[in-house]
Amino acid sequence: EAVWEQVQLRYAELLSKWRTDLGGKKNFHNGVGGTYDCIAIMSYYVVCKAITSFREIEEMEENLILPTFRKLKFVDCNKPFWRKLMYRAFVRAKSGCDKWHDYEMSVAPYENGKPIYYEFTSCPAAEFAIRHGLTDIMPALCNVDYASMELLHAKLVRTTTCVDGCRCDYTICGDKDPYLKGHPEYRDEAGFRRNR
């Protein structure tokens, strides 16, 4: 209980010096596993750094995000219908980002038979981590993007993030797509899942 109280105090302290304009309840990025949950996990990490592990933080984020994707296990990104529907969801997400100015997002035009591509050039969670010297734990929060896509019979191909570059890139294709052969996955020295 004392640890939880410290985490809550740290969370309130960190947020008091940061943005309060992230779109409120209507912003899907503020839902379960979203921006504020990431900041809460970072607050936990600050308080419990000596006794927690990278994997524990990664599991916390997975426990927040993955239940929603598990409910969508019928989605198969290998099928054009689902790929097109995912693309439309990303275009809709971009319109929200344009309204809230939290994540700056661009979505490439849809091409039949090709992977979906979008990117964030601004990420509040990454900005928060950079500002507070917490970039070492960001891979544990970002890697869930790979796991969530895998639950949709999709694969994420990523080469950079807003934490260590100027954008967070998302190339998404079906898990059987030949495109993947040219982009093997690996973990970099910081712990980020990436692709070549």
Where are these regions (language model features)?
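Short, cationic low-complexity segments
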Residues: A147, E185-R196
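Short, charged/polar, Gly/Pro-enriched secondary-structure boundary elements
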Residues: A125-E127, D175-G182
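A short, structure-level motif marking secondary-structure boundaries and short turns
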Residues: H29-N30, A129-H132, R187
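Short, low-complexity, polar/charged sequence segments that are solvent-exposed and flexible
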Residues: D136-L141, D175-P178, D188-R193
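Amphipathic interaction/junction segments at domain boundaries or subunit interfaces
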Residues: G33-R131
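Short, hydrophobic/π-rich interface segment
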Residues: S106-D164
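C-terminal edge-of-domain segments
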Residues: T159, G165-D175
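N-terminal, charged low-complexity regulatory/assembly segments
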Residues: E1-C48
